[in-house]
Structure formats: structure tokens, C-alpha cells
Swiss-Prot record:
Pfam families on file: Aminotran_3
Native source organism of the sequence: Pyrococcus furiosus (strain ATCC 43587 / DSM 3638 / JCM 8422 / Vc1)
Top-level taxonomy: Archaea, Methanobacteriati, Methanobacteriota, Thermococci, Thermococcales
Name recorded for this polypeptide: Putative [LysW]-aminoadipate semialdehyde/glutamate semialdehyde transaminase
NCBIfam families: argD, PRK04013.1
Metabolic or biological pathway, per its Swiss-Prot or TrEMBL entry: Amino-acid biosynthesis; L-lysine biosynthesis via AAA pathway; L-lysine from L-alpha-aminoadipate (Thermus route): step 4/5; Amino-acid biosynthesis; L-arginine biosynthesis
Needed cofactors: pyridoxal 5'-phosphate
Subcellular location: Cytoplasm
Catalytic activity, as annotated: [amino-group carrier protein]-C-terminal-gamma-(L-lysyl)-L-glutamate + 2-oxoglutarate = [amino-group carrier protein]-C-terminal-N-(1-carboxy-5-oxopentan-1-yl)-L-glutamine + L-glutamate; [amino-group carrier protein]-C-terminal-gamma-(L-ornithyl)-L-glutamate + 2-oxoglutarate = [amino-group carrier protein]-C-terminal-gamma-(L-glutamyl-5-semialdehyde)-L-glutamate + L-glutamate
Length: 366
């Protein structure tokens, strides 16, 4: 069962390119919604994962394995968090973060943001904003409330000694590729510290893409919990929940979480990203789309939102016709989440194509 309208049947990928069942080639500026950070069929990554498939795939949570320590050794080169819970998806990372926050503080209230997206399982869905995701599944988990994103005064009013945690995306993805402003992030950090609550940064989409390992690093603020997913395994389902506090063993767990194949995928992905400096180079590849019908381009690095004056569906469709795959973030935002291996020339080629299609589409009388 698929929840998405069928558009293309893709059959193979190589680097930043994918091919459909008719043999047509596309530049992939979606990358599985930000997943394939090393592109498709990266030779080193594929080779190491093939070796792992022949060695050990799942061991079960009651056993240890060397791939976990290989992953942790690579992870420690990017972050200083003391504890990591390994799951299978971004929504699982968020569920873990919410459970850990309630366990650690003994409180129930979770504050999330308008236009936030944190996942589709019940806890993460309760923190998600858009009614189209929520309405059919009510009643959701009690104890959640939303405040306007980037509203300092609303944060001051909402965060109290009853609050277990505040969860937010440093750059809202599904919400339109909207960065948090510095004053707002600093206010969240100051208020949560003052009230004894925890600050959770959801980096499932923004992690790795903005020129720094975590987008929150741009704000010089350290959250209590960070969630990561999508690109961290370059396509193998895996997620991380990072904290500086321990959680009692047995309070949370997963059959597949932390399996050798997933840990190997993270280790190899991080090693290649670090060696090739792909995270740092992403900062230099941000493109600004210009045109009479463009309101603005926002985001950081290779997490890009192009805000239009009119709905973007026709632009997305025509770009696909011309061999470029892009995504949306609402009716009026084109979202780009390309592989980090994309070159400056290639991203500039995409920029020209997008500007050309926008001008062609909106230049028509119909």
C-alpha cells in the first residue's frame, strides 16, 4: 500500500542520477526525501554493505557486535553526546526522545510548533501540526500543545515548570523549509533550562545538510536531545536519538534497532562524509532562485525551499518532464534535498533549469 500518488517507476540509480522503467534519466534533487546523501550506488558504501550482508545482519538487542562500536567511533568525531539510542526511522527517534523526556523529568507536557512535522506514529504525530496528518487518528496522545514557530512571546508564556520538553526543527522541512530565528532558539534554550524542561532538536531532515553536522550548531545552542534519521545511513533504515543523560535499561527498546547492518551503514556513511568533507562543502552549494514569480529562497546548504507566488504543482511536473526530480513543502514551496555529492556545476545546472521552467510556466496565459 502506498500513501503517495504514483509518478515514476524508478529502476536504478548512479550518483545523482536515477532512471525510470522507460530508460529516461533524471537528476535526483529529492534523494529519497533527503536520504541518499552519498547519492545512489556509491561504490565504497555498496562494497562495505555487501560484505556486511555476508557476515551478520541482525543479532538481536540482547547481543553486542563490533559494528556498533565502529559506528560510535565515527559518531564521536562529530558530536559529544554521551548516550545514543539506535532506532529504525526518524519517527522512532522522535518517539524515543518524547519517552525519554517524560521519564527524565517526570512531567507529561510536550510543547511543539505550528507547521512542525515529526513523524506519523502516535507520539510523533501528536507533535506534528498539519490537520491532514492528524484528524483521522484522533484522539492523539494527551499532553501535547503547539505554539507559533519563531514566536518568542508565545514561548515565554507556554513554557512552565509543568513542561517536560520542547521539540522543534531548527529548519522546518515539511513546514516550508523555514529556519528558526536565533532569538527564538536562544529563548527556547534559556526557558527550558530555567524551568527544568528539556530541549529536543529534531534533525531528522536538517542533519548533515546545512554545512554543519547538525543545523542547531549554527545557533551555538546545545539541545538536551537530538533526533537524527534519513541520511545518517544513506538509505538503510536507521535513526539515532542522542542525549547527555542515561535512561533506565528496559524502559525502551527495539528488535531491529542497532542491528549490525544499520550500524555499518552509519559508520561507512559518516566516514565518507568526513573524509570527503561533504558536510562542509554543502554550505557552499546553496542556490538562490530568482524570478518575477519567486518570493524568496530560504534554507541552508543543501536544504533549500523556493517560495513561489503561485502553486508549484505544474512547475514540479514540468521539471520532471525535463529530467529533474524535485519535491514540495506545501502548495507554494519547491523543496530541494539533493545528494551531498552534487557538484557546484550540477546544482547550478539545476538552478538554471528551475528558473527556466518557472518562467515558462508562469509566462503562459493559461
Amino acid at each position: 500500500m502506498s500513501l503517495y500518488r504514483k509518478r515514476l517507476r524508478l529502476v536504478k540509480g548512479e550518483g545523482i542520477y536515477v532512471w525510470d522503467s522507460q530508460g529516461k534519466k533524471y537528476i535526483d534533487l529529492i534523494a529519497g526525501i533527503g536520504v541518499n546523501v552519498l547519492g545512489h550506488n556509491h561504490p565504497e558504501w555498496v562494497s562495505e554493505l555487501q560484505e556486511q550482508l555476508e557476515k551478520l545482519v541482525v543479532a538481536g538487542p540482547m547481543f553486542d557486535h563490533e559494528e556498533k562500536y565502529e559506528m560510535l567511533e565515527e559518531l564521536e568525531k562529530f558530536v559529544t553526546y554521551e548516550y545514543v539510542y539506535i532506532g529504525n526511522s526518524g519517527t522512532e527517534a522522535v518517539e524515543a526522545a518524547l519517552k525519554f523526556a517524560r521519564l527524565y523529568t517526570g512531567r507529561k507536557e510536550i510543547i511543539a510548533m505550528t507547521n512542525a512535522f515529526h513523524g506519523r506514529t502516535m507520539g510523533a504525530l501528536s507533535a506534528t501540526w498539519k490537520p491532514k496528518y492528524r484528524e483521522d487518528f484522533k484522539p492523539l496522545v494527551p499532553g501535547f500543545k503547539h505554539i507559533p514557530f519563531n514566536d518568542v512571546e508565545a514561548a515565554k508564556e507556554a513554557i512552565t515548570t509543568e513542561t517536560a520538553a520542547v521539540i522543534f526543527e531548527p529548519i522546518q522541512g515539511e513546514g516550508g523549509v523555514v529556519p528558526a530565528n536565533e532569538e527564538f532558539v536562544k529563548t527556547l534554550r534559556d526557558l527550558t533550562e530555567d524551568k527544568g524542561a528539556l530541549l529536543i532538536a529534531d534533525e531528522v531532515q536538517s542533519g548533515l545538510r546545512t554545512g554543519k553536522f547538525l543545523a542547531i550548531e549554527h545557533y551555538k545552542v546545545e539541545p538536551d536531545i537530538v533526533t537524527m534519521g534519513k541520511g545518517i545511513g544513506n538509505g538503510v533504515p536507521v535513526s539515532l536519538t542522542l542525549t547527555n543523560f542515561d535512561v533506565e535499561r528496559g524502559k525502551h527498546g527495539s528488535t531491529f534497532g542497532g542491528n549490525p547492518l544499520a550500524c555499518k551503514a552509519v559508520a561507512v556513511t559518516l566516514r565518507i562524509l568526513r573524509r570527503e568533507k561533504l558536510i562542509e562543502k554543502a554550505a557552499e552549494k546553496f542556490i538562490e532562485i530568482k524570478g518575477e514569480n519567486v518570493v524568496l529562497t530560504r534554507g541552508k546548504g543543501l536544504m533549500i525551499g523556493i517560495v513561489m507566488k503561485k502553486p508549484v504543482a505544474k512547475v514540479v511536473e514540468e521539471l520532471q518532464n525535463r529530467g529533474y526530480l524535485v519535491h514540495t513543502a506545501g502548495q507554494r514551496v519547491i523543496r530541494l534535498l539533493p545528494p551531498l555529492i552534487i557538484s557546484k556545476d550540477e546544482i547550478n545546472q539545476a538552478k538554471s533549469a528551475i528558473e527556466g521552467v518557472i518562467n515558462d510556466i508562469y509566462g503562459r496565459k493559461n
